[in-house]
């Protein structure tokens, strides 16, 4: 028995010493260098220069999600994710996406309970174009009756496809409704058909004017650019 105990103790000592040796040689992640700015229009800007590849990735975070929707207007944040691709003063329907694709880039968006995020990845020499397009749709989005009604039907169909017509599609909605009895997280991001049908163009315009403003947004740029030059471009647009 004593021999077994001695062997066990020795094994534990060896394991402990090995763990300490491993801990001392652990590779630590590189330091993340970035600059944080607040512009005069209260837009928050985060810049992280990375010259490893000749591309730039941009995300613009609007700090509005399903938790911020007015009562009886669930799905508005997600609806606006769609509306932001439907043209502005200087860009036609879906032109934002097609321009990014034409230079070899990608763009998309997603909506959560807390945020609506739009992202673009482009070759670095198209940074100026990308910033101009984001500024254009933030300031001059085309919010008209025809596009609103068309996109509302798209969102309703998306709900039918992803939730209503799936065997367990509404399970998460029931779980959230039980977990958050009063908190706005109980409202599904996709919204309800009834709320979407009840919405009006005036509701949509009010939502846009309230939340899609520089003071409610954070722009993140990471990639192959000169930090000072990128900062000047953002201030320009």
Language-model features and meaning:
Residues 1-11:
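Bacterial N-terminal signal peptides that target proteins for export
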């Amino acid at each position: 028995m004593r021999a077994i105990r001695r062997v066990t103790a020795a094994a534990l000592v060896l394991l402990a010493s090995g763990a300490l040796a491993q801990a001392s040689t652990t590779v630590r992640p590189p330091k993340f260098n970035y600059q944080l700015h607040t512009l005069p229009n209260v837009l928050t800007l985060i810049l992280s220069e990375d010259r490893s590849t000749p591309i730039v990735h941009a995300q613009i975070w609007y700090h509005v999600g399903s938790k911020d929707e007015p009562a009886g207007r669930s799905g508005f944040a997600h609806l606006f994710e769609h509306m932001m691709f439907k043209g502005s003063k200087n860009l036609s329907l879906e032109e934002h996406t097609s321009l990014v694709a034409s230079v070899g880039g990608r763009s998309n968006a997603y909506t959560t309970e807390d945020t609506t995020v739009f992202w673009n990845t482009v070759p670095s020499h198209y940074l100026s174009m990308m910033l101009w397009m984001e500024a254009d749709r933030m300031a001059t989005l085309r919010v008209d009756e025809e596009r609103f009604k068309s996109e509302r039907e798209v969102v309703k169909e998306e709900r039918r496809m992803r939730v209503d017509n799936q065997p367990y599609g509404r399970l998460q909605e029931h779980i959230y409704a039980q977990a958050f009895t009063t908190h706005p997280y109980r409202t599904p991001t996709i919204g309800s058909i009834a709320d979407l049908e009840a919405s009006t163009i005036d509701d949509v315009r009010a939502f846009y004017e309230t939340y899609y403003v520089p003071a409610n947004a954070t722009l993140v740029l990471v990639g192959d650019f000169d930090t000072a030059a990128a900062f000047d471009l953002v201030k320009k647009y």
